[in-house]
């Protein structure tokens, strides 16, 4: 009897190890399709992008290794430098405005009745779920220099004397792009901030107000630390989206007038698929990826230290 019990105890670890091994193999098998997809459509293109950026790669001739020449040419290319400047302007203007406006709106609607909060969340989120092409076409009509609503309102209010070609004038085109980007990018941050503010411990806020804290002090000392992770996420996502601004440019201005709305993303597309200079376009892609990674790391460092 004792021998049987001992044998049973010895067999249990073996069965446990076999079961764990089977579960591990099954887990890897379930993971395999996603892993193959990730390697094939993310890792491989990234590696090839970096690799071909060191070549003079074109559709019309064989690839020629040129080392860092593409990168050197980038910083002597006036069109690229203009696109870099425009991209940075879009990021510097749109990211803070998006975050501040979204937090302000969320703070205003989070304390409304539940039905009102839900209604405003849907209203602000509509541009996100609506196709970007459809939204862009509507804005293009509104900015039309013949029958657009902005020219009609401007003349009726006495602000302008004649129609303005908003998207065809170098003075206004980039500002119009930023305005459209702002209206289409605040929906998700508002929804996220409403959720984050709704999860703030109100007992702490009430206790602070009882102790004499103002609403601003209560927000800064109690609410802000609790919504910091959400703010970090919004900062990073908004920054990436601003750097990757492409559809608006493609559909509204094609980089014009006179390259005044060129962005790095659009210039990559134009160089690779219009001029067929794949190596040069990939070099721009590498620079863009480095810029996004560095800025995201800085944002993460600053917000974490706060």
Question: What do these predicted regions represent?
Answer:
Residues 1-21:
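Short, Lys/Arg-rich, polar N-terminal cytosolic tail immediately upstream
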Residues 22-306:
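A structural signal for multi-pass alpha-helical bundles of membrane permease subunits
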């Amino acid at each position: 009897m004792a021998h049987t019990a001992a044998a049973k105890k010895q067999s249990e670890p073996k069965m446990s190890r076999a079961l764990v091994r089977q579960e591990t193999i099954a887990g890897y098998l379930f993971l395999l399709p996603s892993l193959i997809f990730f390697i094939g459509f993310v890792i491989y293109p990234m590696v090839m992008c970096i690799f071909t950026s060191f070549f003079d790669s074109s559709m019309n001739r064989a690839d020629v290794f040129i080392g860092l020449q593409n990168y050197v040419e980038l910083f002597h290319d006036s069109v690229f430098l203009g696109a870099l400047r425009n991209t940075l302007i879009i990021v510097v203007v749109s990211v803070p405005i998006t975050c501040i406006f979204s937090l302000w709106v969320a703070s205003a609607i989070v304390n409304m009745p539940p039905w009102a909060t839900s209604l405003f969340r849907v209203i602000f989120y509509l541009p996100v779920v609506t196709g970007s092409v459809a939204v862009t076409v509507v804005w293009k009509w509104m900015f039309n220099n013949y029958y657009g609503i902005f020219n009609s309102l401007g003349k009726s209010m006495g602000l302008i004397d004649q129609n303005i070609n908003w998207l065809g004038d170098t003075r206004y085109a980039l500002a119009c792009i930023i305005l459209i980007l702002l209206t289409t990018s605040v929906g998700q941050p508002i929804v996220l901030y409403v959720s984050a503010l709704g999860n703030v411990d109100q007992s702490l806020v009430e206790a602070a107000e009882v102790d004499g804290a103002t609403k601003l002090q209560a927000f800064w000392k109690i609410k802000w630390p609790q919504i910091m992770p959400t703010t970090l996420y919004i900062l990073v996502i908004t920054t990436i989206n601003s750097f990757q601004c492409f559809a608006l440019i493609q559909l509204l201005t094609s980089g014009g007038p006179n390259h005044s709305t060129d962005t790095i993303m659009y210039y990559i597309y134009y160089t690779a698929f219009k001029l067929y200079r794949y190596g040069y376009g990939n070099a721009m892609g590498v620079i863009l990826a480095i810029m996004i990674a560095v800025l995201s790391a800085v944002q993460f460092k600053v917000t974490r230290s706060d």
